């Protein structure tokens, strides 16, 4: 990471400031997605995996995980669409 003097931020053009703001918004959005994925993984793992005794999932565990993740993804898609429609 570069060492940027905070005073230099005032020297940026409006276009550069908008570009930086857009970049930061995109990075924040990516972080939110990563956080959601981590939460889904944790919740679904706890819900579907009762014990880890080898490197394979049972067919029931695979089905549970797929269903769990799909349910969260469907819910998120609906929430995002609802937010987009309300804007």
Curated annotation (Swiss-Prot):
What quaternary structure, including any partners, is listed in this protein's UniProt entry? Heterohexamer; composed of 3 copies of TIM8 and 3 copies of TIM13, named soluble 70 kDa complex. Associates with the TIM22 complex, whose core is composed of TIM22 and TIM54. Interacts with the transmembrane regions of multi-pass transmembrane proteins in transit.
The entry's family comment says: Belongs to the small Tim family.
Main location as per UniProt: mitochondrion
Name the UniProt record assigns to this protein: Mitochondrial import inner membrane translocase subunit TIM8
- What gene name is listed for this protein? TIM8
One GO cellular component term of this record is:
mitochondrial intermembrane space protein transporter complex
The domain-related comment in the record is: The twin CX3C motif contains 4 conserved Cys residues that form 2 disulfide bonds in the mitochondrial intermembrane space. However, during the transit of TIM8 from cytoplasm into mitochondrion, the Cys residues probably coordinate zinc, thereby preventing folding and allowing its transfer across mitochondrial outer membrane.
Q: Which top-level group of life is the source organism from?
A: Eukaryota
Cite the entry's keywords alphabetically: Chaperone, Disulfide bond, Membrane, Metal-binding, Mitochondrion, Mitochondrion inner membrane, Protein transport, Translocation, Transport, Zinc
Q: What this chain does, per the record?
A: Mitochondrial intermembrane chaperone that participates in the import and insertion of some multi-pass transmembrane proteins into the mitochondrial inner membrane. Also required for the transfer of beta-barrel precursors from the TOM complex to the sorting and assembly machinery (SAM complex) of the outer membrane. Acts as a chaperone-like protein that protects the hydrophobic precursors from aggregation and guide them through the mitochondrial intermembrane space.
Under Pfam families, the record lists: zf-Tim10_DDP
Protein's GO biological process:
protein insertion into mitochondrial inner membrane
GO terms assigned for molecular function: metal ion binding; protein transporter activity
The protein's organism comes out as Candida glabrata (strain ATCC 2001 / BCRC 20586 / JCM 3761 / NBRC 0622 / NRRL Y-65 / CBS 138)
Motif Twin CX3C motif mapped to chain: 44-68
- Subcellular compartments: Mitochondrion inner membrane
Q: How does it sit in the membrane?
A: Peripheral membrane protein
From the record, give the cysteines joined by S-S bonds: 44-68, 48-64
């Amino acid at each position: 990471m570069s060492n940027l003097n905070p005073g230099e931020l005032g020297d940026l053009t409006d276009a550069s400031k908008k570009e930086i703001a857009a970049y930061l918004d995109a990075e924040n959005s990516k972080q939110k997605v990563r956080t959601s994925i981590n939460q889904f993984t944790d919740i679904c793992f706890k819900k579907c995996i009762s014990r880890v005794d080898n490197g394979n999932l049972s067919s029931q565990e695979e089905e549970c995980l797929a269903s769990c993740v799909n349910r969260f993804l469907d819910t998120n898609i609906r929430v995002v669409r609802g937010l987009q429609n309300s804007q």
